[in-house]
From Swiss-Prot:
Name assigned to this protein: Envelope glycoprotein
Source organism of this protein record: Simian retrovirus SRV-2 (isolate 2R-18B1)
GO BP annotations, alphabetical order: fusion of virus membrane with host plasma membrane; symbiont entry into host cell; virion attachment to host cell
Gene that produces this protein: env
Region Fusion peptide: start-end pairs: 386-406
Chain positions of motif CX6CC: 463-471
């Protein structure tokens, strides 16, 4: 068959056929698109719901709310955690039976009550819930007895239900008061260990009593942004050439991604920090998730860190000693709390993770709305497409945020905020010095009293008799006076700045009193100035109209009456 034998319509059909490419494509792009639709857990891309979903893939605690990833939409839906009602104590408990634990999704508010010299929690039951093992309907059996992860709630809806303030080991109430009490207990225990090993260090990320260069943020946050930009510049220089690094306002919640580090130390060389709330990502997609498990000893010395509910543990490593996280890694345990050190008597399950800051990237060529213009023009702010840090760094387990909109800048309030924080810190420090002075004085008085009671002054003094290492009076009254004097000088300086302002000192101090009278005086002055002119104009206009009316002639129109002669007969009398 030659070319001439091929019909023309076949040739036309060949040229009109669209080119089709076959293949699965880059899986990293698919993961990025999926995460752009899902968002981060605490962003609540699926919105807030009243009741928690019955079937979900993972759950993440976000302090004030709990995020659930349901199996139908995969967007994180959030449920607000119950709060302590007004009048936190109602007296005697309205229940006769008390449960060990009640899930937080079964009530909205709770109160404290007493029964038998013990404190319990009580609330009105809003719904029933069956206890679950593992993450929803995915069972995760750990050990022989401690396998229940999520508590339930059974009873009559609309009636009071009471339960213990302390949950059993390895049982979670879904971010309710029992989980918060467990977190506080673990935090206190870690703080005790930290105080016994390291000196106390006071630092507040927002306290800037003095200017620290041109930056308007604290040094720690600035160093974090600098390190993030350096890493971004090495991994993706095109994006780092011109971009914005955006930090969310409020308490930071870092991102936790799985770590491949398998080295676990048991010494105390690692830093000990309080439990840190994180957002675990990509753990639900792990095929081989390795978890660390320490069984409970069923005693009061157990430090219950909880069980993980955001991943399925395929392999479990039993641990019976303290753990120190490897460099740049943390242990993420129950209620997605991160730890750098787990004490000897810890119990629960944890996974090893790497933390990254919750920073979003806005490319330099992306249109960013100006908040001030949008505010004054009453326009809705345009959505800014953020690029998550994980995508910018080229990590395959990339995550995108569901955040839209850009927060208002607080640069204008930096000076005022810094000054207010400085004043509050100075007052707080002064009160603390007063308290230290009172404590020191009380200790000295107590030592003298004990020494006088024992009559041991002749044996070398009270300190030697009592074998006290510290026997002096820490007089901080001078420091208190200096700080109060500094505050007074600062206030006097501000008053002087106000007094030196010509706006308030003009006319020998009479200007502030004359300002309220300025408006009526101005109105009176305008009336006196332009009143006669306006009055003359009105009089002239009226006179002109009257003259025009008088100048017009009066026209009178009349007609002669017609006389009608009928030609009648007249009688003539002679």
């Amino acid at each position: 068959m030659t070319v001439k034998d091929i019909p023309f319509w076949r040739v036309l059909l060949i040229f009109q056929t669209a080119r089709v490419y076959a293949g699965f494509g880059d899986p990293r792009e698919a993961i990025t698109i999926i995460h752009q639709q899902h968002g981060k857990p605490c962003d609540c891309a699926g919105g807030y719901v009243i009741t928690a979903p019955t079937v979900y893939l993972a759950t993440v605690s976000c302090s004030s709310h709990t995020a659930y990833q349901p199996s139908d939409s995969l967007k994180w839906r959030c449920v607000s955690n119950p709060t302590l009602a007004n009048g936190e104590n109602i007296g005697n408990c309205p229940c006769q039976t008390f449960k060990e634990s009640v899930h937080s999704s079964c009530y909205t508010t709770y109160q404290e009550c007493f029964f038998g010299n013990k404190t319990y929690y009580t609330a009105i039951l809003a719904s029933n819930r069956a206890p679950t093992i593992g993450t929803s309907n995915v069972p995760t059996v750990l050990g022989n007895t401690h396998n229940l992860l999520s508590a339930g709630c059974t009873g009559t809806v609309g009636q009071h239900i009471c339960w213990n303030p302390k949950a059993p080991v390895h049982i979670s109430d879904g971010g309710g008061p029992q989980d918060k009490a467990r977190e506080i207990a673990v935090q206190k225990r870690l703080e005790e260990i930290h105080r016994s090993l390291f000196p106390e260090l006071r630092y507040h990320p927002l306290a800037l009593p003095k200017a620290r260069g041109k930056e308007k943020i604290d040094a720690q946050t600035f160093n974090l942004l600098t390190a993030t930009y350096s890493l971004l510049n090495k991994s993706n220089p095109n994006l780092a050439n011109e971009c914005w690094l955006c930090l969310p306002s409020g308490n930071p919640v870092p991102l936790a991604i799985p770590s491949n580090d398998s080295f676990l130390g048991s010494n105390l060389s690692c830093p000990i920090i309080p439990p840190l709330l994180v957002q675990p990502l990509e753990f639900i997609n792990l095929i081989n998730a390795s978890c660390l498990y320490s069984p409970s000893q069923n005693n009061s010395f157990d430090v219950d860190v909880g069980l993980v509910e955001f991943t399925n543990c395929s392999t479990t490593l039993n641990i019976s000693h303290s753990l120190c996280a490897p460099n740049s890694s943390v242990f993420v345990c129950g209620n997605n709390k991160a730890y750098t050190y787990l004490p000897t008597n810890w119990t629960g399950t944890c996974v090893l993770a790497t933390l990254l800051p919750d920073i979003d990237i806005v490319p330099g060529d992306a249109p960013v709305p100006v908040p001030a213009i949008d505010h004054y023009l009453h326009r809705a702010r345009r959505a800014v497409q953020f690029i998550p840090l994980l995508v910018g760094l080229g990590i395959t387990t990339a995550v995108s945020t569901g955040t839209t909109g850009l927060g208002y800048s607080i640069t204008q309030y930096t000076k005022l905020s810094r000054q207010l924080i400085s004043d509050v810190q100075a007052i707080s420090s002064t009160i603390q010095d007063l308290q230290d002075q009172v404590d020191s004085l009380a200790e000295v008085v107590l030592q003298n009293r004990r020494g006088l009671d024992l009559f041991t002054a002749e044996q070398g003094g009270i300190c030697l008799a009592l074998q006290e290492k510290c026997c002096f009076y820490a007089n901080k009254s001078g420091i208190v006076r200096d700080k109060i004097k500094a505050l007074q000088e600062d206030l006097e300086k501000r008053r002087k700045e106000i007094i030196d302002n010509p706006f308030w000192t003009g006319l020998h101090g009479l200007l502030p009193y004359l300002l309220p009278l300025l408006r009526p005086l101005l109105c009176l002055l305008l009336l006196i100035t332009f009143g006669p002119l306006i009055f003359n104009k009105i009089i002239a206009f009226v006179k002109q109209q009257m003259d025009a009316i008088q100048a017009k002639p009066i026209q009178v129109h009349y007609h002669r009456l017609e006389q009608e002669d009928n030609g009648g007969v007249y009688l003539r009398v002679s």
